Amino acid sequence: PILKAPKLQITKQSDKKVYAVGETGYYKLHITQGKEGMTAQNVKVVDEFEKEGMKVQKIEVKLNEKDITSDCKIDAKDHQFTIETGKDLGENDVMTVAYQVVFEKRIEGAVKNTAVAGSDNTEDDQDENTVVVKPPVLKIEKSTAHKSYKEGQSGEYKIRVTQRNENMTAHHYSFPQCF
C-alpha cells in the first residue's frame, strides 16, 4: 500500500533586497498544502533571522483571507518568531503571515532569513530570503565667503549635508561644530 500524506509548501518574500539602517522591511509568507484530498493538521510557522540587529513587529496571520491572528499563539522575539496557528490546511486553503522588520543597526554582510512551515502530520518545508542592510553615507561640505577672518570679525558659514547611497535616508543625524 502507498502511504499518502499531506505536503506543505512555504514561500517567503520581502518588499526589497537592500534596506537602510532604521528602515522597515515588509515580509510575507505564503503557505499551502498541495496534495488532493489531504489536510495538514495544526500548522506551525517558525521564522528566524540568522543575525541580530532587527526587530520583528506587527505579525498578522490570515487563513483564506480571514484574519486569525488573535486565534494563534505567537512567541515573538527581536529576530525570530514562532506561530502555533491551531488551524488545519486543506488542498484549497491558503495561509499568509505578514510582518514588519525594523532594521535597527548596521549588520555586516548579507542577512539570511529562514521560514519553516510544519504540522502534526507533514514534513517541514522551508524557504529563505536574503537582504543587505546598508548605512546611509553622508557627505558634508562647508563653505564661507572669506578664506580667513580677523579676531572679533563675524563669519558666515554654509554647511551642506547630502546622503550618497541611492534610495536611503539618514535619520536623526548630528555633527559637531568644527572650525
Which positions does each model-derived feature cover?
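Exported/extracytosolic protein signature
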Residues: P1-F179
